[in-house]
Amino acid sequence: MRSHILGKIELDQTRLAPDLAYLAAVPTVEEEYDEFSNGFWKHVPLWNASGDSEDRLYRDLKDAAAQPTAHVEHVPYLKEIVTTVFDGTHLQMARSRNLKNAIVIPHRDFVELDREVDRYFRTFMVLEDSPLAFHSNEDTVIHMRPGEIWFLDAATVHSAVNFSEISRQSLCVDFAFDGPFDEKEIFADATLYAPGSTPDLPERRPFTAEHRRRILSLGQVIERENFRDILFLLSKVHYKYDVHPSETYDWLIEISKQAGDEKMVVKAEQIRDFAVEARALSERFSLTSW
């Protein structure tokens, strides 16, 4: 796992509370890449390429600065964090995120953009604790704690889940560089850069051949009508068992083959490629159209 803690700030709960209340009240709309999730998944753009409050698409900024949206003036504490904790020179986007009773399927980000993936640098900070909310990055599952500033290696296979209805609002701030860089360059105050903290990594159970056999037995019940549901079910397995999240797609393809439905096999292969291999900017994928 390359994801790691960069530092930590003490969140002022009194100042944070009205910001979180405002973000919670922003209407939920269909998200970019909404097919990656089920349940409640919400992004509120604070800085983006256009300054448009409805623009949720991440895209490369070259020779241009990220623009604040109208939401920024309603979240003064988060505005202060973004502008004083971070150096805005290479800022691409800043947004709040929330996930409740939902999972984001394993995927890779930045595959639709122009820079080398190592030039993108995503930070993630949980703003409120949700004990059943987790991230995964390659072979590791993480429970992020409020105030921890994480580098989230979104260029590798990763996922997120919240097994509860307890809100888990967070702040995601993205940077991009044109050449080699030091990760501490993202901070306005170099003293905030304090890597090396011990993360909270939940223990997972061993994954055995018997577990795999049981998963593949879903080939007896999968249909086009529940294909999407089974994908999201499979995406949760690696949070409880010590298995790589990309196995989700290997299982889905094998289960589809057992069903004897060639269109289902093709769709399983296509969602794998769309999620972790390559896709065009703004390209969408349907899990329910056949």
Curated annotation (Swiss-Prot):
What does the entry report on temperature?
A: Optimum temperature is 40 degrees Celsius. Is stable below 40 degrees Celsius.
Q: Provide the pH dependence.
A: Optimum pH is 6.0. Is stable from pH 5.5 to 9.0.
Residue numbers binding 2-oxoglutarate? R168
InterPro entries registered for this protein in UniProt: Asp/Arg/Pro-Hydrxlase, IPNS-like_sf, Pro_3_hydrox_C, Pro_3_hydrox_C_sf
Recall the GO molecular function terms of this protein's record.
metal ion binding; proline 3-hydroxylase activity
Keyword check for Iron, yes or no. Answer: yes
Coiled coil ranges (UniProt) are none
The keyword Nucleus is annotated on this UniProt entry:
no
Q: Which Gene3D superfamilies match?
A: B-lactam Antibiotic, Isopenicillin N Synthase, Chain (2.60.120.330), L-proline 3-hydroxylase, C-terminal domain (1.10.1720.10)
This protein's assembly is summarised as: Homodimer.
Q: What is this protein called?
A: L-proline cis-3-hydroxylase 2
**Organism field:** Streptomyces sp
